[in-house]
C-alpha cells in the first residue's frame, strides 16, 4: 500500500468501508421507497446508485494505497485491451448464453485462433469480469459479458476503444503543442490530432469509415435508452393558457433525431390544438418516415442556417449543443433567437449542467470526451454566457437535486 508512516492505513480502510456500506444502504432504501416510474423516482434511484459507485471507487483506491492505485493504469488498460481483442475475435458470440462453459481448445478450433493466445486473453478478462473462469481452461458468460451481445453496447465499446481512446492517450501531446489552451475547434482537436484526419472533423472522418460510423450510431442509441427525460419537468399543460390555435406551432424539436422527444411532448400536450415539428438533417428525417404520428411534421434543417419556423411557442434543442465549441453554439442559438417572438417564444435546452463544485463521475468523463472534440459540457454560468451572446437570457432551470442533467428555459432579452 505504501502510505506515509504517520497515516493509519487500516483506519482509512475501515472508514472507507463504513462510507461504502452507508451508500449501499441508501441505495437499497431508495430502491424500495421509490418504485414509481416518474422522472423524480428514476432520478432518485440513479443518484443513489451513482453515489454507491463513487464510494466503491474511493474505497478501492484506499484499499490499494497510493502506489498500487497509480499502478492500476497497467491493469485497466490491459483489461480493456483484452476485452477489445476478444470482441473482435468472436469469443462473445462463440460462448453460449445461459451460463454454459466451454473449453479454450474447443473455442480455439472453432474460431481458428491460437489456443495459448485465447487462454491468455480470457484469463485476463475473467479476474473480475466480464467473463467467468469455471475450471482449468473453461470459461462462460456472465450478465456483464452478455451485455456486449447487444449491438448498442458493442457499438459503444468499439467506438470508445477505437476512436476516443486514441484521443485520450494523445491529449497531453495536443494540449502541450497548443500552449495548454482549451480545445475549441471541430477540425483541430485531440481527436483529429490522434487520428490524423487532415483537417476533417470527427463526423467527416467517420463518414469515410462505414464500420466506425455504424459503431458510433449504435453506441449513441444507449443515450436514448435513458428513462430521464428532463423535458418531462416542463409544465406542458400550462401552454393551454395561451389558447393555441390549430395553425400555431406549439413545439419545434431542433436536431430531434428519431422524434422521441417531440412525440413525448405531443403526448404531454394531448388535446391542445397546434403543430408539432421535427427538424434534423435530411437523411435523419427520411429515416423516420412512417414511424412517427402523422400529426408530427418532419422538416429537413441544418441548425447552422436560418430557422424557417418563426414565432413558435417552444423551441427545443436536446443534447446537441455540448457537441460544439462556443462560436458554433452561439451561431446555433442566434439562428433560433432570430426566429423567436418576444414575449411569446421560449427556448428549452436539455443538457448536462455541470455543478460549480463537486461534479460527479458522469459529467467528468463526458466533458473529457467533449474536450477531445473541441467542445465541452458547461456550467450554468457558461450556459448563461453563451445564451447572452445570442441575445437570450435564462428564465428558469428545471433540475432534480443530485442529477447533473437539466432543462434550461431561455427567453429573448
Swiss-Prot record:
First-level EC class: transferase
Cofactor(s) the protein requires to work: S-adenosyl-L-methionine
InterPro entries to which the protein is assigned, alphabetical: COMT-like, O_MeTrfase_dom, Plant_O-MeTrfase_dimerisation, SAM-dependent_MTases_sf, WH-like_DNA-bd_sf, WH_DNA-bd_sf
Database matches in Pfam families: Dimerisation, Methyltransf_2
Keywords per UniProt: Methyltransferase, S-adenosyl-L-methionine, Transferase
GO molecular function per UniProt: O-methyltransferase activity; protein dimerization activity
Disruption phenotype annotation: Leads to complete loss in coumarin biosynthesis.
Documented EC number(s): 2.1.1.-
Annotated residues for binding of S-adenosyl-L-methionine: 255-256, 280, 302-303, 319
GO biological process, one term: (+)-kotanin biosynthetic process
Active-site residues, as the UniProt record annotates them: 322
Pathway terms, separated by semicolons: Secondary metabolite biosynthesis
Function statement: Non-reducing polyketide synthase; part of the gene cluster that mediates the biosynthesis of the bicoumarin kotanin. The non-reducing polyketide synthase ktnS first catalyzes the formation of the pentaketidic 4,7-dihydroxy-5-methylcoumarin from acetyl coenzyme A and 4 malonyl coenzyme A molecules. Further O-methylation by ktnB leads to the formation of 7-demethylsiderin. Then, an oxidative phenol coupling catalyzed by the cytochrome P450 monooxygenase ktnC forms the 8,8'-dimer P-orlandin via dimerization the monomeric precursor, 7-demethylsiderin.
PANTHER family per the UniProt record, alphabetical: HYPOTHETICAL O-METHYLTRANSFERASE (EUROFUNG)-RELATED, PUTATIVE (AFU_ORTHOLOGUE AFUA_4G14580)-RELATED
Family statement drawn from the similarity comment of this UniProt entry: Belongs to the class I-like SAM-binding methyltransferase superfamily. Cation-independent O-methyltransferase family.
Protein name, as recorded: O-methyltransferase kntB
Organism: Aspergillus niger (strain ATCC MYA-4892 / CBS 513.88 / FGSC A1513)
Higher taxonomy: Eukaryota, Fungi, Dikarya, Ascomycota, Pezizomycotina
